C-alpha cells in the first residue's frame, strides 16, 4: 500500500478487542484502576453510529456538531458525507447579532432560536449557503464561502437565524441525496445540534425523513463505552448492546404542509449553489490582490 511494507502495518482486529490493561503510570495519572482492560475502540463515525444504534437496523445517522456528517445504509461498504459548517454557523450568527454573552452562552442560543421559531418557513425569502469554512460535501471545495441571498431591509436577526437553520438543512439534504442509493425512512439525530427542537423539526420538514432522538446525544462516547462492554463480555455483541443501551426519547415526523413548501424552495437552493460556485475564490482573491485604501 503506497510503498509501505505490510509488516510495518498493525494487525487488524475488531474494535472491541482487549489489547491490554491500564498501566501503573496511567493509573497514577488518571485515577483509573491499574489493570483495567483497554479495548481498541473506534473512530468517531464508527462509535457515533453505534451509540446512535444506527448500524445494524437500516437507519441513517446524522451528527450535528461544529460540522456535521451523515452515514446511510447502502449496498456499498460505507456511504458517508460531511459538511464543514453546521453548528459553527449557528454559533457564528449568534455572535454576529450580539447574543454571545460569554457568562451565559446558552441564553444567547435560546433567545435567537425562540425568535427564529416565530419566523414562518422560508425566512422571508432569505436563502443561506452555509459554507463558512470551505466545504467538504457533496463536492469538496476549500474556496467555498457563505452566502445570504435575498437580503432586504425587512430582514432582522430572527430571519437571518431561520435562514441559517434552513440553509444547513437544505445542504444536509443535498448530501443525503448524493450518498443514498435507496429511500431513507428514518434517521437518528445526535450531537449538540440535536438539542434544538426547532432545528430538529426543520431538518425533518426539509428532508421528509422521520427523526429519532436518543436520550444520550453524545453518541460517540456512548459507542466507545459499548465497545468496551462488548470487549470485557458484558454484552454478547455490539448490536445487542446498542439495542439494550440506546433509548429513543423522541420520534419527530415531518409535517406534510411544511415539507411540501420546502420541496418548492429546495430547487432554488440547488440552483443558487450552482450559480455561485464559479465565483468561489474569484471575488475574495481579487479583493486580497488589490491594495486596500487606508481606513
Predicted feature residues:
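Active-site core segments that coordinate phosphate-bearing ligands/cofactors
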Residues: 1-3, 13, 17-190, 194-295
Amino acid at each position: 500500500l503506497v510503498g509501505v511494507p505490510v509488516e510495518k502495518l498493525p494487525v487488524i482486529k475488531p474494535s472491541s478487542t482487549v489489547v491490554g490493561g491500564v498501566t501503573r503510570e496511567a493509573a497514577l495519572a488518571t485515577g483509573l484502576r491499574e489493570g483495567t482492560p483497554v479495548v481498541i475502540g473506534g473512530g468517531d463515525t464508527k462509535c457515533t453510529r453505534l451509540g446512535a444504534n444506527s448500524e445494524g437496523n437500516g437507519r441513517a445517522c446524522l451528527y450535528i456538531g461544529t460540522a456535521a456528517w451523515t452515514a446511510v445504509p447502502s449496498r456499498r461498504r460505507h456511504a458517508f458525507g460531511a459538511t464543514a459548517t453546521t453548528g459553527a454557523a449557528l454559533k457564528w450568527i449568534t455572535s454576529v447579532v450580539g447574543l454571545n454573552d460569554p457568562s451565559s452562552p446558552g441564553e444567547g442560543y435560546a433567545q435567537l432560536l425562540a425568535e427564529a421559531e416565530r419566523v414562518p418557513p422560508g425566512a422571508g425569502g432569505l436563502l443561506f449557503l452555509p459554507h463558512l469554512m470551505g466545504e467538504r460535501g457533496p463536492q469538496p471545495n476549500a474556496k467555498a464561502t457563505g452566502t445570504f441571498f435575498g437580503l432586504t431591509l425587512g430582514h432582522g436577526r430572527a430571519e437571518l437565524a431561520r435562514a441559517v437553520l434552513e440553509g444547513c438543512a437544505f445542504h444536509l439534504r443535498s448530501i443525503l441525496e448524493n450518498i443514498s442509493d435507496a429511500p431513507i425512512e428514518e434517521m437518528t439525530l445526535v450531537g449538540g445540534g440535536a438539542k434544538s427542537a426547532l432545528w430538529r423539526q426543520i431538518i425533518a420538514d426539509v428532508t421528509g425523513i422521520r427523526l429519532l432522538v436518543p436520550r444520550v446525544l453524545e453518541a460517540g462516547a456512548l459507542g466507545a463505552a459499548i465497545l468496551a462492554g462488548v470487549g470485557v463480555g458484558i454484552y454478547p455483541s455490539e448490536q445487542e448492546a446498542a439495542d439494550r443501551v440506546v433509548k429513543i426519547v423522541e420520534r419527530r415526523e415531518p409535517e406534510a404542509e411544511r415539507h411540501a413548501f420546502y420541496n418548492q424552495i429546495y430547487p432554488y437552493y440547488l440552483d443558487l449553489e450552482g450559480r455561485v460556485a464559479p465565483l468561489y475564490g474569484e471575488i475574495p482573491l481579487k479583493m486580497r490582490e488589490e491594495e486596500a485604501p487606508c481606513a
